[in-house]
Amino acid sequence: MPRIAVIFESSPFDRKGLFNAVHNRIKGLLGTGECWVDAYCIHSRDNAFTRAVRHTPYAPVVDSVEIEGITYRMLWYRFSILDHLLVEKFGKRPCLFRRFVKTYVKYLDGYDYVIAHSFTGALFAYEAKQLYGIPYFASWHGSDVHTHPWRVQVIREDTQKVMEAAECNFFVSKALMKSAGKITLNARKEVLYNGVGEEFVKFDKAGVAKAREQFGIAPGEKVGAFAGNLSAVKNVLVLPPIFKTVSEQFSEPIHFIIAGDGKLRSQLEDELSSATHISFLGNVEAEEMPALMNCVDVLVLPSLNEGLPLVCAEALKCGANVVGSDVGGIAEVIGHHNVVPHGPDFVPQFAKKVVAMLEARNDSDDFAGQQALQQLPPEISWAKTTARELSFLA
């Protein structure tokens, strides 16, 4: 039975897309009974000043965290302003973080394989291969391909290095794999979709009514929603004009929900301060997301860049419909007819699709009819992902 180390940078204290994807990948591998898996989670330590500057939530410094029977050994590094300046201002490699990698890579010694998620995880895996000869697989989820390598040349160079040294690189969408071709053509690449957790299911009528009451939605109101980081890459500043246009063009009462937090939250709240029927929920606990998705009629995702947005797949599994921008892997989840290309008419065209989807739901007011409007592609399945990932380890 092979011994596998899974290593990645994320937060078990604020579980969102990347963490949930890795967690479900680990669950899938363990569930086969065909391998032993240990999980290592890399996490930065901020003081009060750097936390305020970076808008990072407080995280308790603990040795390990257990979630659903999986123990994550925490590898802590202190966020360094010196390293930040070296990379972001001077285009140099960080010195303190490199020391952190060389100090803690010893934990990977003795494994048969390393599976790395995120650029930081891949750096550890690369170092383990150089020191101990351990083969590794690197999974790429989005910004570590389409954004960060293009900010700073040394990040692009190191991304190329770790991609080319991997046994195989897995990308969560065809679009992301295509984007990686701009980084290197000399690495093995495969698409390996993420799946959707079993907890994301369509509730019965009583369950939906309870969820709507929980989130303060009045009877008879339709629900439009955004869920994600309130950041520039998510293009959240177009939400106010989209919501306004939808409200003007859709004849029924509609309640808009914004779930998430981030640097642009205050600006969004200011721009929507005079609007009615708007709810800012902040960060929603992972356990509450299925209930929220069961309240949603149409989820909107106007991002400037994406890998494979699991929030779209989760919404579809709960009976919502989704309209998104034509970037990354969004169309691979929700269908090419349900995305809007960025351009001068983005807001009116996006709002038009949202209104059309709301009206179509009125004509298909049951789960089967709503699913017929949009179906989750069958390849977005944890069972298929696990089987395929395991086949590479055979």
Describe the predicted segments one by one.
Residues 175, 195:
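Carbohydrate-associated surface elements
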